[in-house]
Amino acid sequence: MKNIQKILPLYFVAGTQDCRHLGENLSENLLFVLKQALEGGITCFQFRDKGKFSLEHTPSAQKALAINCRDLCREYGVPFIVDDNVDLALAIEADGIHVGQSDMPVQEIRAKTDKPLIIGWSVNRLDEAKIGENLAEIDYFGIGPIFPTQSKENPKPTLGMAFIQTLRNAGITKPLVAIGGVKLAHVKTLREFGADGVAVITAITHADNVQAATKALREASDEYAK
């Protein structure tokens, strides 16, 4: 599963904290949204369950939910990525892990398993991208936040869509997925600027019709596939 560009066109990121508006059963909320998003055509799912409104403080429930999400993704042949939690990712045999600049070094992650784990790395500055470009352990960059976002506590400075173009013009060749406040109207420009895909949270979790919104996002991204 190393043709990374193929899994990035529509990268869905979510946890229970993103679906709490749907009802009291946090796990059922996320599974409902994930199934609709899979039906709509997401190409990758990142389990990012963190914060005071998540299951982060009940690890057993969080692990059980992660396994259910993983199994659902496998029914649809969609890669299942875990955010930050390397131990969880390895324990449940996730397809990949996504880490930030201050998380476990990617060399350590790669050394923990012989399996072909997908590793994504968050990037907010050009110098970070230049460092990551030379790290063979990294499969793709998550670039953001592109726009202001409410989905992450204490987000880093926003970059704007043109930052994707800046990275490509600077010689960055690794696959890129743009994240942070991305909506349907932004997909065309982000793809034209050189993103291999878009990562969304609210554009799916808060859609009136999750499956239809997902389908529209996927079609917009595929239209500009390389």
Swiss-Prot record:
4-amino-2-methyl-5-(diphosphooxymethyl)pyrimidine binds at residues 46-50, 83, 122, 152. Gene3D superfamilies: Aldolase class I. Mg(2+) binds at residues 84, 103. InterPro entries: Aldolase_TIM, ThiamineP_synth_sf, ThiamineP_synth_TenI, TMP_synthase. 2-[(2R,5Z)-2-carboxy-4-methylthiazol-5(2H)-ylidene]ethyl phosphate binds at residues 149-151, 181, 201-202. GO terms for biological process: thiamine biosynthetic process; thiamine diphosphate biosynthetic process. GO terms for molecular function: magnesium ion binding; thiamine-phosphate diphosphorylase activity. Its EC number is 2.5.1.3. Binds 1 Mg(2+) ion per subunit. GO terms for cellular component: cytoplasm. It comes from the Bacteria. It catalyses: 2-[(2R,5Z)-2-carboxy-4-methylthiazol-5(2H)-ylidene]ethyl phosphate + 4-amino-2-methyl-5-(diphosphooxymethyl)pyrimidine + 2 H(+) = thiamine phosphate + CO2 + diphosphate; 2-(2-carboxy-4-methylthiazol-5-yl)ethyl phosphate + 4-amino-2-methyl-5-(diphosphooxymethyl)pyrimidine + 2 H(+) = thiamine phosphate + CO2 + diphosphate; 4-methyl-5-(2-phosphooxyethyl)-thiazole + 4-amino-2-methyl-5-(diphosphooxymethyl)pyrimidine + H(+) = thiamine phosphate + diphosphate. Pfam families: TMP-TENI. Its cofactor is Mg(2+). Condenses 4-methyl-5-(beta-hydroxyethyl)thiazole monophosphate (THZ-P) and 2-methyl-4-amino-5-hydroxymethyl pyrimidine pyrophosphate (HMP-PP) to form thiamine monophosphate (TMP). Belongs to the thiamine-phosphate synthase family. PANTHER family: THIAMINE-PHOSPHATE PYROPHOSPHORYLASE, THIAMINE-PHOSPHATE SYNTHASE. This is Thiamine-phosphate synthase.
